[in-house]
Amino acid sequence: MHPFLSRSFCALATAASLIALPTLGAELDPQPIKPELQRLIDQMYPSMRSVYEDLHANPELGFQETRTAAKLATEMRKLGFEVTEGIGKTGLVAIYRNGTGPTVMVRTELDALPMEEKTGLPYASKAKAQYNGKESFVTHSCGHDMHMTSWLGTAQALLGMKDQWKGTLMFVAQPSEETVTGAKAMLADGLFKKFGKPDYAFALHTGSMPYGTVGYVAGAATSNSDSLDITFHGRGSHGSMPDKGIDPVLMASRFVVDVQGVISREKDPMEFGVVTVGAFNAGSAGNIIPDQARLLGTIRSYKSEVRSKMHEGIERTAKAEAAMAGAPAPEIKLIKGSDAVVNDAALVGRTVKLFKTALGDKNVIPIPPATASEDFSDFINQGVPSMFYILGVYDPKKVAEASQPGGKPLPFNHSPFFAPDPEPTFKTGVQTMTLAVMNVMQ
């Protein structure tokens, strides 16, 4: 996942899920159970803090999360869950049956990012791993370590209050969310065929909000995510004799600029859409015109029609650059990634009402959809009413200071300095997720 609460939020999306909610029982009143839930959370926190620091110090990249998955599997078995490992390569599924009732899925991610941590924390990651053929630092700078710890804490809290809900818990630990391929891998491995399709699903994600708060969207919460991989073919020559060759660097450079015309002149300016070229690879020396140049980039959108228009424009622009240079047609790969996460409006409404009673109205905040992407949508798209919400991580005073004119922005997800405040973040994460699950299991 990527920064959910950056300053680049766009207009609120209005699309909403059309999935019909299964018949629900009475809504949960959180007030009578809050003291018991808080006692359970306070009691588990010291041990969960140790788990958090261990996960943070030992991150693993997507589809390499063997140690991480094994640790979560061990913890869930201690609680009495039936655990199956190796779903989607390194994913795991933990099941707990507690009478007749709905099946509710709670998702966490396992993977970290290929970057160096710079938080200075005593438990900061120093881990390294192979990434794209090179050694890279690895760190949990997207908050997945907190997601996993809250996931474990929620499981423990639910079992501590199992006399107050009925049904089946389906806790899913997903690999490789950062590449938006892990959910697909689990589904391809028969996740819902082997364990049944859940009636509801929930997931949370850390964001740069004050701790003690949560953010929500009723409808599209994240963007569609696709990638581009384009290779322009030229004809190599000496740098002093450009007329003897066909310069692919010039073609690729023109494309990087011209493709933005698809955004500014072809897409409805009121609709969100982004094309970003993040990697430009060509040549080996300054005095050689290479024979090819390769571009890698990302394509983001909310609506399917905008997505299609951008794909068409990208392909047309790339072909035009090559034709203008008298070069062969470029190799164009537009790779569909994840769809936008679209929260079920009815489930969001029910859950937000509960959150406001538990946390207070001012701490449950409607937010715009993120321009970032998430493959939680792959689970939702199987016909599962779901809610994906944001969990605040920072001292409210620091957030207020950062929002003032001239204030220093706080690090957001994917920053090497991203460091949630563990205790209040964990406690709010467990409280809200436990209540959300119980609210559909009455």
Residue map of PLM features:
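Acidic/His- and Gly-rich active-site-bordering loop/insert found
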Residues: L28-H140, T149-G153, A157-K166
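Metal-dependent amide/peptide-bond hydrolase catalytic core
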Residues: A26-L28, S253-Q442
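Divalent metal-coordination and catalytic microenvironments
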Residues: L55, A94, V106, H144, ...
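Histidine/acidic-residue-rich, glycine-tolerant segments that coordinate divalent metal ions
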Residues: V93, K128-T139, D145-M146, L158-F280, ...
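Bacterial N-terminal signal peptides that target proteins for export
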Residues: M1-L12
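Bacterial N-terminal signal peptides
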Residues: C10-P22
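Short, flexible, mixed-charge acidic loops at enzyme active sites
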Residues: E117-K128, G219-S223, A400-P411
